[in-house]
Amino acid sequence: MIIFEKSVPGRKAYRLPDEELQRIDPVFPEHLKRTRPLRLPELSEPDVVRHYTALAEKNYSVDKGFYPLGSCTMKYNPKLNEYVAGLEGFTDIHPYQPWESVQGALQVMYELKEFLCEITGMDEMTLQPAAGAHGELTGMLIVRAYHLSRNDKKRHVALVPDSAHGTNPASAAMAGFDVVEIKSTEDGLVDLEQLENHLNDEIAVLMLTNPNTLGLFEKDIVKIAEKVHQAGALLYYDGANLNAIMGKIKPGEMGFDIVHLNLHKTFSAPHGMGGPGSGPVGVKAFLSEFLPIPIIRKDGDKYYPDFKLPNSIGRTRSFYGNFLVLLKAYVYILSMGKDGLTRASEMAVLNANYLRSLISKFLKIASPGICMHEFVVDGSQFVKETGVKILDVAKRILDYGLHAPTVYFPLIVHEDMMIEPTETENKNTLDYFAKVLEKIVEEAKKTPEVVKTAPHTTPVKRLDDITATKKPVYRYRLS
């Protein structure tokens, strides 16, 4: 029940002061005035508090349990980060203040970008983008600006592997590029021969995730970088899966020219349900002149925003980006240290391989062998044998108090499930998840209707996805 349906005429949660208030009628012309009052819900304060408390209790988050969404890195978010982000020295400042009066905030941003440059092997970094896809668009605008600065106007094509995130081709298209798909080999890696066949003087960039969305490391990345650069194009790194390689190898060492990161994923700021996020973009030195303004610099013991980049693509976000997300990532990096970040990646890979080994006993893994931080289940044979879809399995997982993995992505595997356990889960949790999944597989064979009609214990049961898509209801009519 939505809060509007709980409304009782005349019930109030407030009382206006007795003194006469100045009427504002003269401010608005007649055609802008309402002819009848808004249909706002009328409830008492306890009604409102109980309504939203009940909704909060129905929510699921990583603080409640296992959240193995593949390609999302739903790791635990340390509460130390939240404490620091709540300090009034950070929450009570304003971006319009003179920069001399916010030296602490500027220091945080400067040191964070230096940390991120060190982690990625880049030379300069902007912290402006508000999310991963926003970072992609920023990066692709830099690619365009670079080629135009060389009067290389023929380069209008962005190459994107078929295993890429869906936002990669979308971001490239938004930046004005024509997108061409590169097929993967049977092993799930970039097809070098096909890549070579596509490389010509019209190619602007190859967008790549490494490890890729199958959880596989592109072992030929050095060759790929060489071929792309020989063709005069740039190599773009989607940092969605950086959690697998921190402290082990840097994208800059692989040959990437541009990197975008997801601080809300890899560096532990809470995310999901639309944000807030942060998608910094790092570049090699020869691309730094195109970064958005301002760049945070240091002069002696003073920090300042530098707007003097004549070839900049301009602002891509108001002010300095999502500052409190930047702050949480900064605290995370400081508390973990270099060795801690390396250990986090090691444990992320270990957990993924342990869980993969358990699940491989009763479900097919799309790419046999060692994976990185995540892996993909190929459920096509399972569906043929049982008539139960992977979507049904995901719905049934909810009945066991767990969040479902990502389903039907990447698109190159049919009836698939992408599982990323992250480094913050213990062996007991992984064992329990594997047992739940095995039990559901048995249910699909013996009592398939139980799985097909799941979930059964959640506040909201099986939704009518088709009607919701074709006839969405976006708002409640207030008048």
Swiss-Prot record:
What are the protein's GO molecular function terms? glycine binding; glycine dehydrogenase (decarboxylating) activity; pyridoxal phosphate binding
Record has ATP-binding as a keyword: no
Q: Give yes or no: UniProt keyword Oxidoreductase.
A: yes
Annotated HAMAP family:
GcvPB
Q: Tell me the gene name.
A: gcvPB
The molecule here is called: Probable glycine dehydrogenase (decarboxylating) subunit 2
Keywords from the UniProt entry: Oxidoreductase, Pyridoxal phosphate
The entry's family comment says:
Belongs to the GcvP family. C-terminal subunit subfamily.
Q: Which residues carry this modification: N6-(pyridoxal phosphate)lysine?
A: K265
Question: GO terms for CC?
Answer: cytosol; glycine cleavage complex
List the cofactors. Answer: pyridoxal 5'-phosphate
Catalysed reaction equations from the record: N(6)-[(R)-lipoyl]-L-lysyl-[glycine-cleavage complex H protein] + glycine + H(+) = N(6)-[(R)-S(8)-aminomethyldihydrolipoyl]-L-lysyl-[glycine-cleavage complex H protein] + CO2
Query: What is any Pfam family matched here?
Result: GDC-P
Record organism: Pseudothermotoga lettingae (strain ATCC BAA-301 / DSM 14385 / NBRC 107922 / TMO)
What GO biological process terms are annotated to this protein in UniProt?
A: glycine decarboxylation via glycine cleavage system
Cite the EC number: 1.4.4.2
What InterPro entries does this protein map onto?
GcvPB (IPR023012), GDC-P_C (IPR049316), GDC-P_N (IPR049315), GDC_P (IPR020581), PyrdxlP-dep_Trfase (IPR015424), PyrdxlP-dep_Trfase_major (IPR015421), PyrdxlP-dep_Trfase_small (IPR015422)
